[in-house]
Amino acid sequence: MTTQLEQLRKLTTVVADTGDIEAIAKYTPEDATTNPSLILKAAQIAEYAPLIDASIEYAKAQSNDKAQQVQDTCDMLAVSIGKEILKVVPGRISTEIDACLSYDTEGSIAKARQLIKMYNEAGITNDRILIKLASTWEGIRAAEVLEKEGINCNLTLLFSFAQARACAEAGVFLISPFVGRIMDWYKAKEGRDFEPSEDPGVISVAGIYNYYKEHGYKTVVMGASFRNIGEILELAGCDRLTISPNLLQELEDATGEVVEKLIDTNGNKECPAAMTHAEFLWDHNQDPMAVEKLAEGIRNFAVDQGKLEEMIAAKL
């Protein structure tokens, strides 16, 4: 029998959730996603040392201000890693903007434009890039502007239905609802494990997927943040799934049957009026898990961004 990874590929676009080019080349995904934590991890791989050195040289040529040099080095490093990854994936790379801009619409737009400019100057066209933004109201508004400029966005740290609905209404290209982190919260709260079919993260993503398809929204649903292959298999049929190398290996080693769980209904239900800012905040706030996990996710990405900046500053 074929492997579960091979079977899954027939139902879902498989994406690698890593900045490790060797791992990406091994599993031949369509796309790859990175985030500040993964860039920090990748920056510690010996093979990437020349990319760091080249990024520092670039930054020094742009400015004499050390703080600006650190920012420019981090941006160029993320783009350089993305460019290397694009040599081994046929599709897109997702590159995330600084988590410190999560509540700054104008700052997010400016940073996204800067990253796109750097990619374009490196010969990478917009159709191979997704700019990752946190699914805050401000991040969603930034994405709405960027999409109209032909800059496709990946809205991440998505935990609530309110976030998912607002993203679809803003016309964003893709969302990354987090499965495992939702399950983590409920596991800690209820003190028990969940079967994949009753996993709160799985149920959340399936609900978002079905809502999008019933209403004809074009936004791509890419399940993310998996803790085990059971969660992945319960979402077989989702538009895309971004999976870490260790779980890709588990799927490669397993041969049980993979059944399509999510099916596009091609619905045409009337879409509700777009949410107002007040409605978004109210609805999101009704979900304590989502409120806590969004804030925690932004803080954690900011911590890893800070560690990367410290590492770069020490080399300048």
Swiss-Prot record:
Transaldolase is important for the balance of metabolites in the pentose-phosphate pathway. It comes from Aliivibrio salmonicida (strain LFI1238) (Vibrio salmonicida (strain LFI1238)). One of its GO terms (molecular function) is transaldolase activity. It is an enzyme of class 2 (transferase). One of its GO terms (cellular component) is cytosol. The active site is at K132. InterPro entries: Aldolase_TIM, TAL/FSA, Transaldolase_1, Transaldolase_AS. Its EC number is 2.2.1.2. It is found in: Cytoplasm. Pathway: Carbohydrate degradation; pentose phosphate pathway; D-glyceraldehyde 3-phosphate and beta-D-fructose 6-phosphate from D-ribose 5-phosphate and D-xylulose 5-phosphate (non-oxidative stage): step 2/3. The gene is tal. This is Transaldolase.
